[in-house]
Design a protein with these regions (language model features):
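Rhodanese-like catalytic fold shared by cysteine-dependent sulfurtransferases
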Residues: 9-69, 75, 95-150, 154-210
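Early exported N-terminus immediately downstream of N-terminal targeting peptides
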Residues: 77, 86-94
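Short hydrophobic beta-strand that contains or immediately precedes a catalytic carboxylate
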Residues: 72, 80-87, 114
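Bacterial N-terminal signal peptides
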Residues: 1-9
């Protein structure tokens, strides 16, 4: 099976120049009268954000509960949700022969206790990526659909919205979405720790065999 190389938006790296400067991250059309029409074109027929993943976010997510920076510590302390970081990175399936697959362009600092599942917030996921995502959700929730899950990324990250929506559609009933992500967590005084992405190599290998 031939795999296409998936390239993460440079805007998704906290240290990329585009993020620091804000270059290329604003809505391409500042005209309010055309905003609604253009925004509709950013979604696929299943309602997932399909491109321009770094953009202003809505106030809600289908099937999930929104958590703000001033609430997240209480949510973590009270409900102990599985913390899932979905920040995207470059994926090169052909590199698995060298024991690697994810190629982060800089260290990722996220909320302590988090599991990093890169790219699961994209709209159109390959079958092996869907399995990677769903298997980890089962593991992190002990197979219980009512166990809490909290998704985040960085500020203005539609991938965390997509991941929350997909988990809710799979039947998870306690989905939390933290739209401010690590930016909001750090700004509120939260500690960040360096984390490695979960390996996807076995999923790619299984897909190649099939």
């Amino acid at each position: 099976m031939t795999f296409f190389v998936l390239f993460a938006d440079l805007a998704y790296s906290q240290h990329a120049a585009g993020v620091e400067s804000g270059s290329g991250l604003s809505d391409p059309d500042s005209s309010q009268s055309h905003h609604s029409t253009q925004a509709e074109n950013y979604f696929d027929d299943k309602g997932f954000r399909s491109h321009r993943y770094r953009a202003p976010l809505p106030d809600s997510v289908p099937g999930g509960k929104v958590v703000r920076a001033d609430e997240i510590r209480a949510i973590i302390d009270q409900y102990n949700p599985a913390l899932i970081d979905v920040l995207a990175v470059t994926l090169r399936p052909e590199a698995i022969d060298f024991g690697i697959s994810w190629l982060p362009d800089s260290p990722r600092l996220n909320i302590p206790g988090s599991v990093w599942l890169p790219n699961v917030g994209r709209a159109d996921l390959e079958p092996y990526m869907l399995r990677f995502f769903s298997d980890h959700l089962v593991e992190l929730t002990d197979g219980k659909l009512d166990n809490p899950i909290l998704f985040y990324c960085i500020a203005d990250c539609w991938m965390s919205w997509n991941a929350s929506k997909r988990a809710a559609e799979w039947g998870y009933s306690n989905v939390y979405w933290f739209p401010e992500g690590t930016d909001g967590w750090e700004a509120s005084g939260g500690e960040l720790v360096e984390t490695e992405p979960e390996s996807i190599i076995e999923y790619i290998q299984d897909a190649e065999i099939q």
